[in-house]
């Protein structure tokens, strides 16, 4: 009994220490505001302490990839006033809440929830890649619902380059998921779920965000839900 208690305390201490170090690094990078750092730290602790290091690594992969693509063509984005290098707690919750819920379900023995976790993160990553890289394209964006030409940055607008970038983002998370958890089906489910979530983001953005019915965080949340569900459904049929 004492050994179990000691192991629990050690795991708790190590988890807190790792999360504090990561929080300081994120704070220094200025990628998140103070509330965002706190929120992401809580999420990170839940994943690390209750789910394990592999779960945390996958979420960190999304964060790191997001930071990298946000800084691609930064000067061009600043000139167009489309840069968003510092994100808030709302962004953290919109992209991380659904993955955390799937991770909690996985703790309780729902094996399919791991796929939902990976696929929902893939959806968030895919959307980030499309948004951050798509605006650098010289193509004229088209609204996903009507394919009419619209201004860059319009909610629900897509480009071929941005869509392909989104496919890459989803695939990378699917690949990382496979490398971490060892099931080759994760690549397909994660990629497909990520793409589906990204397209759902554009569709909901065109139908509701443009009209002011939903905001960007609502749309991102819906994208992760769709991505997670699609990934799970595909996994269950394989």
UniProtKB/Swiss-Prot annotation:
Source taxonomy: Archaea, Methanobacteriati, Methanobacteriota, Methanomada group, Methanococci
Protein name according to UniProt: Uncharacterized membrane protein MJ0933
Short name of one Pfam family: DUF92
Alphabetical UniProt keywords: Cell membrane, Membrane, Transmembrane, Transmembrane helix
Intracellular or extracellular location(s): Cell membrane
Record's GO cellular component terms: membrane; plasma membrane
Keyword Zinc in record: no
NCBIfam families in the record: TIGR00297 family protein
């Amino acid at each position: 009994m004492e050994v179990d208690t000691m192991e629990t305390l050690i795991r708790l201490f190590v988890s807190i220490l790792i999360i504090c170090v990561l929080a300081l690094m994120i704070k220094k990078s200025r990628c998140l505001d103070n509330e965002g750092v706190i929120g992401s730290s809580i999420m990170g602790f839940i994943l690390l302490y209750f789910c394990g290091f592999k779960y945390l690594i996958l979420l960190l992969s999304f964060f790191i990839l997001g930071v990298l693509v946000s800084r691609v063509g930064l000067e061009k984005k600043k000139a167009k006033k489309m840069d968003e290098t510092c994100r808030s707690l709302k962004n953290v919750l919109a992209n991380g809440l659904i993955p955390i819920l799937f991770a909690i379900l996985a703790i309780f023995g729902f094996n399919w929830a791991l796929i939902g976790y990976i696929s929902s993160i893939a959806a968030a990553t895919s959307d980030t890649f499309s948004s951050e890289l798509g605006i650098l394209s010289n193509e004229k964006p088209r609204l996903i619902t009507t394919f009419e030409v619209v201004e860059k940055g319009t909610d629900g607008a897509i480009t071929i380059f941005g869509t392909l970038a989104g496919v890459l983002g989803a695939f990378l998370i699917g690949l990382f998921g496979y490398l971490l958890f060892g099931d080759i089906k994760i690549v397909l489910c994660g990629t497909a779920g990520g793409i589906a979530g990204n397209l759902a983001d554009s569709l909901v953005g065109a139908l509701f965000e443009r009209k002011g019915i939903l905001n960007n965080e609502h749309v991102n949340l819906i994208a992760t839900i769709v991505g997670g569900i699609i990934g799970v459904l595909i996994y269950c049929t394989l």
